[in-house]
């Protein structure tokens, strides 16, 4: 593990090169500048291409899962070529490379899924036989659960690509994270926001996570003011739930925690890819037990589903 390049005078932020990833990196830079009175040239953003960005013709579940979006960036972090990495937390595996951790979560944006419709504004108002594009197994399963009459097609690409395909009439509607659209200034394209009690989001959705080297005390001090208490607590629960279920891009898993004062509420769900089977679990407790609540919820929902629920489709 290399020493921090920030010792040479510039903090280096690693990120994917998409518009959304860059918007999140620029937000992180601005927050660091405001927290520490740093000039703009004290922080450099280094866009990187990842395997997940390059492979666009197949579902992520077929080619390696969430790690495809992080491997190259994490190697740069381990090598000392960058000091921190900025990620969409929902894209992060629960097991990180040795020596790295998600040290800080920024204040969460709206975690809900957004529907962008062409033939109907509301998802539930789509005509029978309509076509919806999504590459997320969770969204595909939820769509099939709620509207088994709808055809779901694989739909990859960045936000611009997906919206362009929609405008071209390739599908009648698509789903994107509300948070990403808002960060890109595209909230006006949203035609429907899905109720998380009916269409629960992915664990970590809407939250930006900052990955750093374990034991890099100077970086820890720099990042500390950016940590958002409620988001940190909620994601401790959600990621514990995901991790206990061995969640990846190959598993339709949903989960959302909310924090009020010293109390936490959590709702999680696991589904079969066809949406025909779904098992839901809820949990409540004190915030200090966030991770334990997530793990316990995962154990309970796994027991509900039975030992063969995951067979044949992981």
UniProtKB/Swiss-Prot annotation:
Pfam families membership: Porphobil_deam, Porphobil_deamC
What the entry lists under PROSITE patterns is as follows: PORPHOBILINOGEN_DEAM
Residues bearing S-(dipyrrolylmethanemethyl)cysteine? 249
Which pathway does it take part in? Answer: Porphyrin-containing compound metabolism; protoporphyrin-IX biosynthesis; coproporphyrinogen-III from 5-aminolevulinate: step 2/4
Asked if the Swiss-Prot or TrEMBL record annotates the protein with the keyword Transcription, the reply is no
Q: What else is known?
A: The porphobilinogen subunits are added to the dipyrromethane group.
What protein does this entry describe?
Porphobilinogen deaminase
- Per the UniProt record, the source organism is Brucella canis (strain ATCC 23365 / NCTC 10854 / RM-666)
